[in-house]
């Protein structure tokens, strides 16, 4: 046995799983599901009756929460599906760099500089326009399965 102390750096996810299992029959519209390895928001669920050979099936129609693509999957209702852990966090916008990255202020006073400007034109114009006018903006960042993206912007007044 050694008397050495072990120091561990804390990581954001601490090895936590990016998804959790949930029975297909219990997933509802506006819930989340992983289809083809992508985190999606369910927009339509239909179930078929139990057939002669097997289970009732759930037909999911969902939209990828990051790229907006429509995906579909059919799963026996008694089987488990992966459901992504989806988090939404608000950060105050500090700066926009020339290369398209934003500088955000976290709750504990650190800066977060690893996010690009949104690709959605309306959201992009709202962020850039508000920043150029000197408004105090709060950006909502959605994160799931190791990906992050700016999904909304709020104006909290003009800078004093």
Swiss-Prot record:
Residues 1-12 have a biased composition (Basic and acidic residues). Residues 1-21 are annotated as: Disordered. The keyword DNA-binding does not apply. Signal peptide: none annotated. Keywords: Hypusine, Initiation factor, Protein biosynthesis. The modification Hypusine is found at residue 52. It comes from the Eukaryota. InterPro entries: IF5A-like, IF5A-like_N, NA-bd_OB-fold, Rib_uL2_dom2, Trans_elong_IF5A_hypusine_site, Transl_elong_IF5A_C, Translation_prot_SH3-like_sf. GO terms for molecular function: ribosome binding; RNA binding; translation elongation factor activity; translation initiation factor activity. It holds the Pfam family eIF-5a. Belongs to the eIF-5A family. This is Eukaryotic translation initiation factor 5A-1/2. It comes from Solanum tuberosum.
